[in-house]
Amino acid sequence: MVARLVGLSERIESVAFSPDGSMLAVTGGLPGRMGEVQVWDVAKRSLKISVPVTYDTLYGAAWSPDNTLISFGCSDNTLRAIRVRDGKQVLLMGGHNDWVLDSVFSRDGKQVISVGRDMTAKHTEVESERLIDNLTSITPGALKGGIAAVAGHPTKDEVLVGGSDGQPQVFRLKRQTARKIGDNANLVRKFPRMPGRIWDVSFDPAGKQAAAVSSLNGDGMVTIYSSDYDSGIPDDIKKIFNKTPNGGEKQKLEGYWAREVSELHSIEMPGVEIFCLAFSPDGRILAVAGADGTVRFIEVASGKVTREAVAVKIEGEVIADSVSEGEKRRLNRKRGKRAEISERTISPNEISALVLDPAEIVLTKPNHYAQILVTARLKTGGRVDVTRQVFTEVSGGLAAITERGQVKPLRDGEGVLAARIGGIKVEARLKVTNVHSAFAPDYVRDVKPVISR
């Protein structure tokens, strides 16, 4: 290890060296609280600038070719860029419909290409902050899932993208045919599909080969492709792009997109998900890393792993847990595993009245729940939350209540939920129905909010 660069971020989502190698950009933040862009001086091992942005972690740092700008994606569905000199925001593009996961500058530094969970790759002009176009097709089903990674071609105005569908694809930045509804004319090539979700992609320095990494069910995959292809569009293909293709023409397009690209090596990584990769400057070695913290160096010509290095060496076999056997575990504030109470206990003698909110609780489905809040009005005039201190009881066993005041249905009926401290008591009406009804989940209402593309 050469150095440890310690900033404010609890989570690091991306790192990128500047083109001249003098600086390191880092995006991450405090999940659910703050996003942060860090810029480090590599030689001095010192922080040049820290820029807080949005209220969640940031993704996909990328440098402009002249080392002056850094672009990145945000979970508020925006693409942004800042000036390295003073941290000033110079680009804000809000055209995405979901988290923006990666970005890359064009070769001239005048545009930024961004990808995200909304299944699109978008092309944005830096100076005007204007969304130029979607590179990916807007046809339903053209892409089957979000896009997690994008990389620029070293010699062409093209980008390589990869995501949930497991198929790396190359798109051109400049449209060469008139737009037609349903076309996918910016697509240059489709590489053979790989298992699982793609997490990172890259061209080698010459652009003659490409690589992608993915994971599925706890296993990783590294695939190296030949990418020495002609980007020109033949006249017969242009004619198809200029109209709505029939079945035979669609097959012809698929053949064109698969032309001159092939899989060279497919390297399985059993038991370890692989998330990132990088080519060496001479293109002979591909470094990949994943969930086990080990960097593996693969010889591109043979596809063999030639060396492994542990990113952080752990001395001894001490588990990161200072709680001895039999000792009560502390509250894990990151995961909320336990509800241990450390607040001051309110005496009944201090309370003039209790207030329970809501005054009426109605649970109409087996998976419904309600959160109650019990507030103590103090004789001194103040108010205190005593939800975690009250003794609760429900008539007829209609519902269960957790220590934090979450009410879950157990059986149908009507009754009363009571909360008390000492002799001071407050009640709320409770009605529970349809506890034993079959639950029919709705995709939009119940499933979509908790899954990721």
What are the roles of these predicted feature ranges?
Residues 331-452:
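Extracytoplasmic soluble-region selector
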Residues 1-334:
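WD40-repeat beta-propeller superdomains and closely related acidic/aromatic-rich repeat-like regions
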